[in-house]
């Protein structure tokens, strides 16, 4: 009687396990041949979870033992059911795919914000270097991971949505592939990529606000932003001042009526042609300031300037321009 399986070379067969829609197992060898029970020739098996054994459904012969079933515990009969029941898949975000973890902060301060002494500071610098070296090998990977860590820090500090960080990482990757980062600081280029990403996602943040949370200067970030615009051929939409209103109102806890009035003011200003060439954050702050005065909320211009990330002078100038062009009569506090 001939064996139903390929001749053995003395080594245990390596079998690939497939599961059909009825829950039965079929075994396939490395050469692609269907494995059959050596006793009865059957090609369907079941898995004994208690013993870790693959057993023939006809004669009960154990064909594989001490085996871990790495497949799912659920059954599915269609591809749609498999997709619904599967609990694994590709990384949900680029940050996860890059295996980002916590990092040692660059500010050299303890948990209470106190400056570290010189001995401890030198130790932290050394640990920070080794942490970076241990995680990646090539200079490309090290640079990208540093940028990803910087963007994650900015996201945590500024409360920026993850989609913006994802977009910023993609922009930075393109800049890295074109060698635009060479000779420039990672912090400045990452901040510029984030500024661009926020505008592309229609969730803009003022450049001055972004600069407050990074080590790079405003001039460096602005220069890197212009470089990205020029070299990557990215079309960045002109920032709509109304996109800044909800965030300003949220920070100052303003009512929905104030928000509605501020949006109406900006729409009228846009029709009048007085918004072109103006800082959108400053226009939004001035519009919200006017709207709050109209609704009896007499806060200072400084409050709105801080919330919008602009100066008091900007709010004052935009306020005067809007009030004059739209003939709005409100008292100035």
Swiss-Prot record:
GO molecular function: DNA-binding transcription factor activity; TBP-class protein binding; zinc ion binding
Binding-site list for Zn(2+): 37, 40, 56, 59
GO cellular component: transcription preinitiation complex
Gene Ontology BP terms: transcription preinitiation complex assembly
Record's keyword annotation contains Transcription regulation: yes
InterPro entries, per database record: Cyclin-like_dom, Cyclin-like_sf, TFIIB, TFIIB_arc, TFIIB_CS, TFIIB_cyclin, Znf_TFIIB
Protein keywords: Metal-binding, Repeat, Transcription, Transcription regulation, Zinc, Zinc-finger
Zinc finger (TFIIB-type): 33-64
SMART domains: CYCLIN
Sequence repeat start and end residues: 149-232, 243-324
Family assignment from sequence similarity: Belongs to the TFIIB family.
PANTHER family: TRANSCRIPTION INITIATION FACTOR IIB (PTHR11618:SF13), TRANSCRIPTION INITIATION FACTOR IIB-RELATED (PTHR11618)
HAMAP family: TF2B_arch (MF_00383)
Function as written in the Swiss-Prot or TrEMBL entry: Stabilizes TBP binding to an archaeal box-A promoter. Also responsible for recruiting RNA polymerase II to the pre-initiation complex (DNA-TBP-TFIIB).
Protein's name in the database: Transcription initiation factor IIB
Originating organism: Pyrobaculum neutrophilum (strain DSM 2338 / JCM 9278 / NBRC 100436 / V24Sta) (Thermoproteus neutrophilus)
């Amino acid at each position: 009687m001939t064996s139903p399986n390929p001749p053995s070379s003395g080594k245990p067969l390596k079998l690939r396990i497939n599961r059909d829609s009825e829950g039965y197992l079929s075994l396939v060898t490395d050469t692609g041949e269907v494995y059959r029970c050596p006793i009865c020739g059957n090609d369907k098996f079941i898995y004994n979870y208690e013993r870790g054994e693959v057993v023939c459904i006809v004669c009960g012969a154990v064909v594989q033992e001490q085996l871990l079933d790495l497949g799912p515990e659920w059954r599915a009969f269609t591809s749609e059911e498999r997709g619904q029941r599967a609990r694994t898949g590709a990384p949900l975000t680029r940050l996860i795919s890059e295996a980002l973890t916590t990092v040692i902060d660059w500010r050299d301060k303890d948990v209470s914000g106190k400056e570290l002494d010189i001995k401890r500071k030198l130790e932290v610098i050394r640990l920070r270097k080794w942490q970076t070296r241990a995680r990646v090998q090539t200079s490309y990977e090290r640079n990208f991971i540093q940028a990803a860590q910087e963007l994650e820090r900015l996201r945590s500090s500024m409360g920026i949505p993850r989609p913006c960080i994802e977009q910023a990482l993609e922009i930075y990757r393109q800049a890295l592939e074109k060698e635009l980062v060479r000779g420039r600081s990672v912090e400045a280029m990452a901040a510029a990529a984030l500024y661009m990403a926020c505008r592309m996602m229609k969730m803009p943040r003022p450049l001055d606000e972004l600069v407050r949370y990074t080590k790079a200067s405003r001039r460096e970030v602005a220069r890197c932003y212009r470089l990205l615009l020029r070299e990557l051929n990215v079309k960045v939409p002109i920032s709509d001042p109304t996109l800044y209103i909800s965030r300003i109102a949220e920070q100052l806890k303003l009512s929905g009526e104030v928000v509605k009035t501020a949006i109406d003011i900006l729409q009228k200003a846009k029709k009048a042609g007085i918004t072109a060439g103006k800082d959108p954050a400053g226009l939004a702050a001035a519009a919200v300031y006017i709207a709050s005065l109209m609704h009896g909320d007499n806060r200072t211009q400084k409050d709105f300037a801080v919330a919008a990330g602009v100066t008091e002078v900007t709010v004052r100038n935009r306020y005067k321009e809007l009030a004059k062009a739209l003939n709005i009569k409100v008292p100035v506090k």
